[in-house]
């Protein structure tokens, strides 16, 4: 089993896509990249942390490359600290890696993707230093709150688009 930690907008959206994916064993939303011991409130108030999803996956069933391809389909890697109406550093596009092999794969992936995108890809690649699990009410948010307004307006259409691709 391997982990990759991705940030690309609201962590509810990213998790909702990946928790349904064959080969993904578990997802967990959290915070990384900022001050120690964050809370949702401190992240929203600019403590430097990014909303991320830790994806635990079986590399025999799904590759990191496949995960990154999907990641780039579900968020805008050319948008600086903004995804849709969500604005702020906590929505930064980032790949946190745990080993050099994953770093190189991510770098090569972005280089190849840049040939396709007309705008500059701003997704950062950074070694994971610290990761903090988010509050329990954020975990598997879409599954637990499918009728919530944000879920219906933002997450559900994203899932429908991915399923139709």
Swiss-Prot record:
Active site (catalytic residues): 10
Keyword Oxidoreductase in record: yes
Catalytic activity: L-methionyl-[protein] + [thioredoxin]-disulfide + H2O = L-methionyl-(S)-S-oxide-[protein] + [thioredoxin]-dithiol; [thioredoxin]-disulfide + L-methionine + H2O = L-methionine (S)-S-oxide + [thioredoxin]-dithiol
EC number of this enzyme: 1.8.4.11
Highest taxon, organism lineage: Bacteria
UniProt entry keywords in alphabetical sequence: Oxidoreductase
GO term, biological process aspect, one: protein modification process
GO MF, one annotated term: L-methionine:thioredoxin-disulfide S-oxidoreductase activity
Listed PANTHER family: PEPTIDE METHIONINE SULFOXIDE REDUCTASE (PTHR43774), PEPTIDE METHIONINE SULFOXIDE REDUCTASE MSRA 2 (PTHR43774:SF1)
Family annotation (NCBIfam families): msrA (TIGR00401)
Function description: Has an important function as a repair enzyme for proteins that have been inactivated by oxidation. Catalyzes the reversible oxidation-reduction of methionine sulfoxide in proteins to methionine.
Family: Belongs to the MsrA Met sulfoxide reductase family.
Name of this chain's protein: Peptide methionine sulfoxide reductase MsrA
């Amino acid at each position: 089993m391997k982990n990759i930690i991705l940030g690309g907008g609201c962590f509810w959206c990213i998790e909702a896509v990946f928790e349904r994916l064959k080969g993904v064993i578990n997802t967990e939303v959290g915070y990384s990249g900022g001050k120690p011991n964050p809370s949702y409130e401190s992240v929203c108030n600019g403590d430097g942390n990014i909303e991320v999803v830790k994806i635990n996956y079986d590399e025999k069933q799904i590759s990191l490359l496949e995960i990154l391809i999907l990641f780039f389909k579900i968020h805008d890697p050319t948008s600086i600290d903004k995804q849709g109406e969500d604005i702020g550093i906590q929505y930064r596009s980032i790949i946190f890696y745990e080993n050099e092999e994953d770093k190189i794969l991510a770098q090569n992936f972005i280089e190849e993707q840049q040939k396709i995108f007309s705008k500059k890809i701003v997704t950062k690649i950074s070694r994971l230093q610290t990761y903090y699990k988010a509050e329990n009410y954020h975990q598997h948010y879409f599954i637990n709150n499918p009728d919530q307004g944000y879920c219906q307006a933002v997450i559900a259409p994203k899932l429908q688009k991915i399923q139709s691709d």
